[in-house]
Amino acid sequence: KTYDFSEMFIVWNTYMDRAQATVRTHGDISFSQGGSFYDVLYGIKHYGLVPDSELPAGVKHGDTLSDFSEFSRVCDPFVEGIVKGRKLQTDANGNPLWKEALAGILNAYIGERPETFVYEGKEYTPKSFAESTGFNPDDYVNLASFSHHPFYEPFIIEVQDNWRWST
């Protein structure tokens, strides 16, 4: 069976994860556009998948492609401001308010992540849908070759977009 998965579902979750890592490291991890192949595998494994019809690219722009130019001008300084803050504000349950605010930005520019959805007459969560496809992220590996690492050996790819420090 052929599927058309939503890239934006992975993008939404990756931006939130990257922001959390940036805040946790006091800005030592770059919060910017870009990512690695592992971000996709991690996203599928931890968050699941949704069909493109549930969160299509460009849905907020009336286009078939997403435009991140304004999004980046809004989101990047927001995360930088959180990093520079002296004390993070929390709600009554101790949850950081900035995550809710960032989710609002992501929802405004990318679209809202579905908690549940119906696909071909059956109700799914993103995780149950991913499981139903039979796609196993553990069946895939990153391949790279750099002359300063031994060939045919795993290593952490030292590039800015590999902020998860995956091999």
Q: Which residue ranges define each predicted feature?
A:
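Catalytic-core signature of thiol
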Residues: 1-167
